[in-house]
């Protein structure tokens, strides 16, 4: 376990999956991250790479060959190399290996850079094409935040506040794939009240979100967090059935749709990176 801390926050990181496993505020004395209780969901904040969500039949085709990948890809299950740069920064690195090449025929370098900036935790993803052909990939975040995380509150006391005017149209999932059915969630102002039955039919998948900051707040006190993200064209909100957490998931990529032809080059949201090029995105969370 790797620990980063400053005067305001302390985070715990694991080499397996380069996963964030703890987010503690020294000021509020509160833990903001989900504890990975296996009764509900045994993860905290996995990185989704080189795909987001599920593939149709758990497989794709590329240059005439068929390959298999599990839901959300393989990065979350691999041990990353890491370097602790300072008390407030660490970098994790994963490259292709014999195992990854069986299901994903690309050469890559994936870097996750965690930094503490005052009361904020910043996570920057960087992908480098180290191969001799175009690199195709998707990437996404999946942090789970504890709800409730303060005494004398319950799940229904909490809500998500969006920083832009939203018409929350989401795509319904069908056996983990994006269906052709959408639904509209009515907001009270910029506010989505949390309730467990929001997620009884899997994640809410958004393709047209206007906000770049979502705040997790509650009606009983002033504690909460701001979750900021830039240039992620897809977003998911999810919780396991009746679980005491909510996941805020910015994605560059999305699960296959039910009518997808399984050709990787046709996959919605797939990123195409030229030889030697690099690509990056970040998200950050501020606890209060």
Show where each model-derived region lies.
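Active-site/ligand-binding surface loops and adjacent short beta/alpha elements
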Residues: 147, 151-229
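Acidic-aromatic substrate-binding/catalytic surfaces of carbohydrate-active enzymes
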Residues: 10-66
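Acidic, contiguous internal or C-terminal segments within carbohydrate-active enzymes
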Residues: 96-143, 148
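Glycine-rich active-site loops that engage anionic ligands at enzyme catalytic sites
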Residues: 218-259
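Short, structured beta-strand/loop micro-motifs enriched in basic residues and often containing a Trp
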Residues: 43-50, 258-266
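Extended, loop-rich substrate-binding clefts of extracytoplasmic carbohydrate-active enzymes
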Residues: 65-118
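Short Pro-Gly-centered flexible turn/kink motifs
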Residues: 13, 60-68, 271-287
